[in-house]
């Protein structure tokens, strides 16, 4: 991570998740948020706060993209369309899991790779809450998070996959734009991707049907 973070556990927060994250990142748990980046565990889940911004993963925001016939209009869904039963996909640069969610909504069993521990714990919490949602739970059940570097993990895959999706984070061009506020916050802790070639080579080595 490119910036030091504070781990804050408030009343009602998931202590087991906070303690596991604290061990993973070699940080101590505080009762108060930090001045800059804070991973906050409270009764609402896990969020990233700092610099006057706050972000929490929430797949409910994706509902309008997968209901009322809208899913089939998504470019990713059209590109990965398949009638094969038991199809599997990898989202090698999961981020907050939006693209993996679209693949899972299409029926794929999706493995999400995320190497940044902060983004991974935000995604883990978002999936945990989605699995309790009456509509989202069926989609979320097809999504599995693996924390680690996909460049290192994909060449060791034993089971064949049908789709490998790559969407590395690139520098934001309009850092003052409201649409990039989430990206601004995340880029405080993870710089833009610098492994594009390695990522593509690792995906090729896994021999998917599509990539």
Residue ranges and their predicted role:
Residues 101, 105, 125-129, 205:
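Short, well-ordered alpha-helices that flank and scaffold nucleotide-derived cofactor binding pockets
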């Amino acid at each position: 991570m490119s910036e030091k973070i504070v781990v804050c556990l408030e009343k009602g927060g998931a202590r087991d998740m906070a303690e596991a994250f604290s061990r993973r990142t070699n940080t101590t748990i505080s009762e108060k948020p930090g001045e800059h980046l804070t991973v906050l565990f409270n009764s609402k889940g896990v969020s990233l706060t700092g610099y006057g911004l706050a972000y929490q993963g929430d797949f409910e925001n994706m509902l309008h993209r997968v209901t009322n016939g809208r899913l089939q209009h998504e470019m990713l869904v059209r590109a990965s369309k398949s009638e094969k039963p038991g199809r599997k996909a990898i989202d090698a640069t999961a981020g907050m899991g939006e693209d993996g969610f679209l693949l899972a909504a299409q029926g794929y069993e999706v493995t999400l790779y995320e190497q940044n521990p902060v983004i991974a714990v935000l995604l883990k919490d978002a999936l945990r809450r989605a699995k309790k949602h009456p509509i989202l739970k069926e989609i979320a059940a097809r999504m599995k998070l693996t924390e680690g570097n996909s460049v290192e993990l994909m060449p060791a895959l034993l089971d064949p996959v049908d789709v490998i999706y790559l969407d590395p984070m690139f520098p934001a061009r309009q850092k003052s734009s409201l649409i990039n506020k989430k990206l601004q916050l995340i880029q405080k802790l993870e710089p833009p991707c610098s492994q594009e070639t390695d990522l593509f080579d690792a995906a090729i080595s896994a021999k998917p049907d599509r990539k």
